């Protein structure tokens, strides 16, 4: 983050039910409009080929996408946000991102531990992530651009509301809708095995644990 920030208030705004730590992912319902999802390492799966020549694997109830030899992405959880102070009296929301990992090796799986990555991101970080993913696809394999569609992010504040930007952007209902949109976006990305394989370095950099500035 470019701004020098201080976290206020001490406790994050709760936008989610704390009991719902493993939300149900409804990716199939939006797959037709958003592009294919590929997955692996699941017990209940069916596969078919799409028009782009890629294999789509539908799995229930678990999906995962390999990030390295040891772990696969299992799901992402965008939870409560914290309102922070930036320069010049501005305020913005920082989201807590938790990505759950599934061990690929029996040695890790036998430990029955919960493997996860946790970091903090602003909406603008998601915007840059999407831009970087699109640039990578266009540069590396432009013919795959239609097959590896990147879902849209939840909208930013509309121009006609810019005069009350702070009020709109920090509204709890607005933030709750943004949380759901960011969570869908991130899950769509990390559960697409073809996309992960092509953009692994970009995703790893995005998920690098953040240092919170007091």
Swiss-Prot record:
Region of interest (Disordered), ranges: 1-63
Chief location: membrane
PROSITE patterns linked: PX
SMART domains named in the record: PX (SM00312)
Molecular function terms from GO: phosphatidylinositol-3-phosphate binding; protein-macromolecule adaptor activity
Localization: Endosome membrane; Vacuole membrane
Biased composition (Acidic residues): 16-31
Function of the molecule: Recruits the lipid transfer protein VPS13 to endosomal and vacuolar membranes.
UniProt-recorded name of the protein: Endosomal/vacuolar adapter protein YPT35
Organism field: Saccharomyces cerevisiae (strain YJM789)
